[in-house]
C-alpha cells in the first residue's frame, strides 16, 4: 500500500469571499448532496438553491432532512435549459457546479449525453455567469482528465490526456471554464478530485457495487488481475476541499484534491472482503475493459499549502463507516439494483 506524499503544514487561512447565496448544480447527486449539507451548517450562507435534473443517479432522498431547511430551495431542471439557468444565476452570488454524467462505463454507450451535459451544460452556466456575474464559479472535475501515469504524480500544470469519453468530456469542460476566466474574467476555479467514496453513493460505482453485492451474498467481479491503482478520497474530505476553494481559491487556478492512500483494485477488494469476513472465493475475475487506465496519481500539495486542506478520514475507518451505512439503509440502494441501474457495463467490442 502506497500513499501520496504528505503536504507540508501551513498556517495559511483562506480569505473568505462573498458566499451568501449559492447555486449548487447537481446538488441531489452523491457529492453534491454532501456539499449542500456542509453549506447548510455554515453560518455565513443565507440561501442555497439546488438545481438538479434528477436523472437515474440523482435523488431528492440524498438531501433527506435538508429539504426542510428554510435556507434551501430545490429546483428540478437541466443545466441545458438556458432560460432557467439565466433566471437562477441572477439570484445568486456564487455557483458550485457538480452536475455531470460521471460513470465511465456508461460513457462508452452514451457519449453524446456526456458531451451535452458535461460540455454544453457547463458552457450554458458559464455564459450566464459571464452576462450576469457572480463572485465565484467553482467547476468540480476529476483526476481522470490527466490520464494514466506510469510513475510520479500529476500536479495542476500536468497535461490533460483523457482516454475515455467521460474523462474527455470533463477535460473539455475544464478548458471551457478556464477559457471563460481568461477571455471574459469570469471568476472560475477548477477542482480535480481523486476517486470518491462514502455513504449514499450510487451502486454503479465500484465500492458500493461490491458492498451491495456482498450484502446480497453475490460474488464481486474484478477486472483482470486487479492491478489498477486509484487514490481514494472520502466524500466529506472532497467537500472540505471544494469549500476551501469556494471561499479562498484564486480565480483562474486549478486545485487537485486527494486522499491519503493509493490502492490497487485487488487491495481495495481485500479490505472490503475483510470487513465482511469473506474470502477470495467470493471474487470472480473477468476480462479487463477497454481503456481501463492502469494508474492515476495526483500531487495535491497546492491546496494543502495554499488553503490549508487536510483529509480527515483514513481509508480503514471510512470504508467501515460506508459499509455500515449500506447495511443500515437497504431502502436507499436496493431499488436501484432492482432497476438495473447498477448493472455491470462493458465497452461493446
Regions found by a protein language model. Give the residues of each.
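N-terminal Rossmann-like NAD(P)+-binding domain of SDR-like oxidoreductases, especially those catalyzing
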Residues: 2-196, 265, 294, 313, ...
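C-terminal substrate-binding subdomain of Rossmann-fold SDR/epimerase-dehydratase oxidoreductases
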Residues: 2-7, 14, 42, 58, ...
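Acidic donor-diphosphate engagement hotspot in glycosyltransferases and nucleotidyltransferases
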Residues: 35, 149-150, 201, 206, ...
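Short acidic-hydrophobic sequence patches enriched in Asp/Glu that either
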Residues: 55, 202, 206, 264
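A glycine/serine/threonine-rich, flexible loop-to-helix segment
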Residues: 66, 152, 203-211
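A short, glycine- and acidic-residue-rich donor-binding loop in the catalytic cores
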Residues: 106, 205, 252
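The catalytic Tyr-centered alpha-helix of NAD(P)H-dependent dehydrogenases
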Residues: 162-169, 199, 203-207, 231-235
